[in-house]
Design a protein with these regions (language model features):
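Secondary-structure end/capping motifs
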Residues: 225-306
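Short, glycine-/small- and polar/acidic-enriched structural segments
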Residues: 26-175, 179-186, 202, 210
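Conserved C-terminal helix/tail region of periplasmic/extracytoplasmic solute-binding proteins
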Residues: 295-332
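Pocket-lining segment of extracytoplasmic ligand-binding domains
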Residues: 88, 162, 168-261
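Bacterial N-terminal signal peptides that target proteins for export
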Residues: 1-12
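Sec/Tat signal peptide C-region and signal peptidase I cleavage site
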Residues: 20-25
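Short linear loop/turn motifs
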Residues: 61, 69, 163, 268-274, ...
């Protein structure tokens, strides 16, 4: 009996040792978001909460952001290694020599929009002439504005553009300090509607600017030094997004657990708003770049000098680190 007990204790100790070793083997990864936590980050929160990262041997810390432009600069400057931001903001820096690359295209079209209160009488983009338009500092909408204006026969001089802090956008519109804002269907638009505002909304994608958007990207050093970690991170993240699309309420619970200050009602509405973006434009798989989408994006952005003409779109992105098609969620 004594031998059995000793063997049992030894086996228990061995198992505990394996568990400890597994815990110690977790690779730490810091993931920089483009924005404050909410519905647009639900897939990553689900990957944490459902244990997908942990099962892949990753100990992931998710850090909130303050605009895609700022997040892209963090990676370009080497202050962050792995992040999530608008593809246009990322591509602009890559075209200028920033050592980084998009490794998973998550939004197949952009959520940007112009938002105006109906009472202002703005019924079309042409009605922005002579108006004051709020532009969120450090975000992706500002750099893309020239493209929207050109596609609709407008110029920046037709209106007064006012750069302002992100937190000031919604109150400035509601208080009449600006007539319209450069917003997003997954952010300001929802916040305004939840406060009872009656809006006229003009999505960029429906007004001549159907560009690819929010994507996972990494520094070239991180990609080169950690290719297997990157593959595991992307696979677990896309699994998290698949879970979030199937279980939105539970995914928002995971967001709330990670970031207790999150407004559940708002985050739920945000997740519902972005859901169509994952498979828009005929995309075949969630998270996989479509060459045609990127070719169109390159052509549009080069028209207004946001990207250089003649650039190979594949210099901005790669699908090399994605799971095999059979392991990815297909778009229906």
């Amino acid at each position: 009996m004594k031998h059995w007990i000793n063997r049992s204790l030894a086996a228990t100790a061995f198992a505990a040792g394996l568990g400890l070793a597994a815990a110690l083997a977790q690779t730490p990864v810091t993931f920089q978001l483009n924005w404050t936590a909410g519905g647009p980050n639900a897939g990553f929160a689900a990957a944490v909460g459902e244990g997908y990262y942990k099962a892949a041997g990753l100990d992931v810390t998710v850090v909130q952001g303050n605009g895609s432009g700022n997040t892209a600069q963090l990676v370009a400057s080497g202050r962050s290694q792995l992040a999530y931001a608008d593809a246009v903001a990322i591509s602009q820096l890559i075209s200028k020599g920033a050592p980084m690359r998009i490794v998973s295209t998550v939004y197949q079209s952009n959520p940007n929009s112009v938002n105006a209160l109906k009472k202002t009488g703005i019924k079309s983009l042409a009605d922005l002439k002579g108006k004051k338009v709020g532009v969120p500092a450090g975000s992706s909408q500002g750099p893309m504005l020239p493209l929207l204006l050109k596609a609709n026969g407008l110029k920046e001089s037709d209106m007064t553009l006012i750069n302002m802090p992100v937190a000031a956008m919604v109150p400035s519109l509601l208080q009449g300090q600006v007539d319209a804002i450069l917003g997003s269907l997954d952010a300001y638009q929802i916040q305004l509607e939840m406060q009872g505002a009656e809006l006229s909304n003009f999505p960029f994608a429906d007004h001549g600017v159907p560009t690819v958007a929010t994507s996972i990207f990494a520094s070239n050093d991180f990609i080169k030094q950690n290719p297997e970690v990157l593959k595991k991170f992307i696979a677990a993240s896309l699994k998290g997004w698949s879970f979030a699309l199937d279980n939105p309420a539970k995914a928002i619970e995971h967001v709330k657990t990670l970031f207790p200050d999150v407004n559940v009602k708002l985050a739920t509405a945000e997740l519902a708003a972005i859901t169509p973006l994952f498979c828009s434009g005929g995309a075949k798989f969630i998270g996989k770049a479509e060459d045609a989408h990127w070719t169109r994006t390159q052509a549009l952005l080069s028209e207004v000098k946001l990207l250089p003409e003649g650039q190979d779109p594949k210099s901005y992105y790669t699908n090399e680190y994605l799971p095999a098609d059979g392991e990815m969620r297909a778009c229906k």
